[in-house]
């Protein structure tokens, strides 16, 4: 039956145990607000992650296809197969020191999360999201997961853009060249990885606060592996990863994942998604005269 259930029991989406529809948490697995204000039976039809992962993946794929079309179709080969032009990325809202500080397009810290530079880029990020996103939704709730995902992306791109703009200052430091290169942020940056690192940061915080060494250890291990991979591989924005992780950790601490998820959390999550969509539209509108040619 479609609608809100106000009495009785529902099935916890995380562990499958029966819980009261108005219980603050599942006493089997600890999930906050397992009844989802009575909408749990309806929301379960969207999957165990309540639609978060399919939504993000779908939106990212749509933006990737649009960026390919703006790039003129299939470009590159091998590891660079289906690469997207910098023109297309800028037109749809890429972030970095150039767009944010040189051009004043501050809203791109919201839109860049939904863009990817090539086929391997989006495949790797979406596989990571599939593994991490569902667990985050189960543990801290869908509303807070969306908030963390968006805010972490903003934090990551702000940090990377700021360090990208600080290149003249960083270059003056009396440090070896390889250290200086590690300190420099990005001039142009896109991708969901900053937000994904934010989810890992949130899980690390939850593990510490709840005393779950398993969640804390697994999330920290994921973060370390992905960060080291970013140091080894060229062209990866590690400062966005670091900023995203920190943003996710602090946002999780602010919203306290051990408490029941509230209606205003879902409202804030919707506002975050609307702001992200508006940021993409702002970049498109700014470049419309060029795009229409």
Give, region by region, the residue ranges found by the protein language model.
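Alpha-helical transmembrane bundle and helix-membrane interface signal
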Residues: 28, 138-139, 205-220, 256-269
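C-terminal transmembrane module of polytopic alpha-helical membrane proteins
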Residues: 1-48, 230-293
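Cytoplasmic-side transmembrane-helix entry/capping segments in multi-pass membrane proteins
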Residues: 146-150, 192-195, 214-221, 269
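Hydrophobic transmembrane alpha-helices
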Residues: 133, 201-206, 248-256
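Alpha-helical transmembrane segments of multi-pass membrane proteins
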Residues: 60-67, 156, 202, 225-233, ...
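Membrane-embedded alpha-helical segments of multi-pass membrane proteins
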Residues: 192-200, 242-246
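N-terminal TM1-TM2 helical hairpin plus the immediately adjacent luminal interfacial "cap"
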Residues: 52-190, 233-239
């Amino acid at each position: 039956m479609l609608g809100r259930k106000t009495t009785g029991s529902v099935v916890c989406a995380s562990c499958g145990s029966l819980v009261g529809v108005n219980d603050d948490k599942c006493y089997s697995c600890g999930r906050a607000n397992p009844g989802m204000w009575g909408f749990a039976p309806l929301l379960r039809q969207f999957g165990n992650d309540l639609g978060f992962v399919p939504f993000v993946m779908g939106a990212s794929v749509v933006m990737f296809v649009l960026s390919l079309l703006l790039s003129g179709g299939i470009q590159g080969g091998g590891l660079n197969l289906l690469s997207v032009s910098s023109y297309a990325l800028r037109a749809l809202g890429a972030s970095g020191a150039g767009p944010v500080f040189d051009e004043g397009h501050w809203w791109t810290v919201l839109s860049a999360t939904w863009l990817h530079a090539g086929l391997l880029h989006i495949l790797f990020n979406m596989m990571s999201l599939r593994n991490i996103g569902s667990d985050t939704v189960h543990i801290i709730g869908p509303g807070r997961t969306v908030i963390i995902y968006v805010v972490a992306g903003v934090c990551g791109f702000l940090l990377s853009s700021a360090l990208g703009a600080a290149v003249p200052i960083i270059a003056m430091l009396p440090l070896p060249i390889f250290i200086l290169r590690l300190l420099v942020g990005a001039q142009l940056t896109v991708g969901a990885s900053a937000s994904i690192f934010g989810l890992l940061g949130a899980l690390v915080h939850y593990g510490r606060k709840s005393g779950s060494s398993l969640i804390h250890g697994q999330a920290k291990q994921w973060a370390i592996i992905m960060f080291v991979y970013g140091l080894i591989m060229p062209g990866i924005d590690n400062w966005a990863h670091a900023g995203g992780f920190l943003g996710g950790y602090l946002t999780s601490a602010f919203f306290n994942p051990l408490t029941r998820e509230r209606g205003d959390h879902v409202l804030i999550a919707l506002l975050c998604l609307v702001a992200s969509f508006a940021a993409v539209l702002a970049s498109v509108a700014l470049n419309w005269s060029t795009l229409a040619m």
